[in-house]
A protein has these predicted regions:
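Charge-rich amphipathic alpha-helical interaction elements
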Residues: 1-159
């Protein structure tokens, strides 16, 4: 029983660790989703900006203005590249957090299984004690009835 108390304390700690690992994993997943959205927005902005440049080009673009468009598009490309690199790093981190969470989950389940094993063992021991008491009662009852029957038989023989 005292060992179960200690195991329950360990189980509580494991649950807290698992919850914290889960929160970290979810946070990273949300970061990945945010970066994917940002990249999509930058790419959409780039696409729209190129469309604007093409429209202006049809009506005539100066060399300076064309260079300005190209420089800005290049900046957008660099931003998207850096965000994709960060996205890959975040995806790897998210997978690490997922693996860590799964390990914490296994740790908790091991303690729960051990507690369940102890509970089943105690239950079996209790059933054995109850069966022993029942057997002792049956034997004592049989012995008492047998003695009474023997006394009746002796009295009957004496008559």
């Amino acid at each position: 029983m005292p060992e179960d108390r200690a195991l329950h304390l360990v189980l509580d700690k494991r649950k807290r660790d698992e919850d914290a690992a889960f929160e970290d994993w979810v946070f990273c997943r949300n970061q990945v989703a945010n970066f994917e959205l940002q990249i999509k927005q930058v790419e959409e902005f780039r696409f729209n900006y190129i469309g604007e440049m093409e429209n202006e080009g049809r009506s005539g673009l100066t060399g300076t203005k064309l260079l300005a468009y190209q420089a800005f598009i290049e900046k957008l490309d660099n931003i998207a590249l850096k965000q994709r690199q960060e996205l890959e790093r975040l995806k790897m981190l998210t997978e690490q957090k997922r693996q860590f969470y799964l390990k914490r989950q296994v740790d908790r389940k091991v303690i729960e299984a051990l507690l369940e094993k102890h509970r089943i063992r105690r239950q079996k021991e209790e059933l054995k004690r109850e069966q022993k008491l029942l057997d002792e009662y049956v034997v004592a009852n049989y012995t008492r009835r047998r003695q009474v029957q023997d006394e009746i038989n002796l009295e009957a023989e004496a008559l």
